[in-house]
Amino acid sequence: MIFLVLWSAASALRIYPHSIAYFNELAALIPTPASPEIPAQEKSSALVRLLNAGPRHGLRHLSDSNIDWGQEDLNLLRWYRRQSGIDKLGVCSNGSIPPGQLGFPLKSVPFDTPAPGWYAIGCDFLCREDGGFRYFRQFTPVTVIGQTMYVYHLTQEEIDARKSSGTIRGLSEKP
């Protein structure tokens, strides 16, 4: 019993101060339906999934305002200001304050087809099956801020490689 209490406390403290995105590690053990763009369970043991779980797996079960309220916009701004070489950042967030008013030098985020540049995409927009930003799932984020804001740097070479391999299509392209 003491072990379970300590585990629960450590689990909650590990994600602090990003508590809205908290998921218990057991979320990694709950099966999810496979999708061509979101891999289902990793082919690893339950113990390995359990030890590497938490908010990373929560997106498979809940999204939208369950996790992403734009709470990481200020942390994204802090991260952006520490970077060099990023002229403009495309931001797609659920925050109530428009990113331009927070001080981001903005660029538009291409809705349907990837374009080179730096982008920060809130997890809600990544999870939507009907959204035009799902193509970002085919790329590896540079960093994840607060478990809800995924930062990508797309290069033309990466985009061309994904398109030529057939792993990425814009919404206007037919499968």
Predicted segments with their positions:
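C-terminal luminal/periplasmic domains and tails of membrane-associated envelope-modifying transferases
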Residues: 30-175
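Interhelical loop segments of eukaryotic multi-pass membrane proteins
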Residues: 23-30
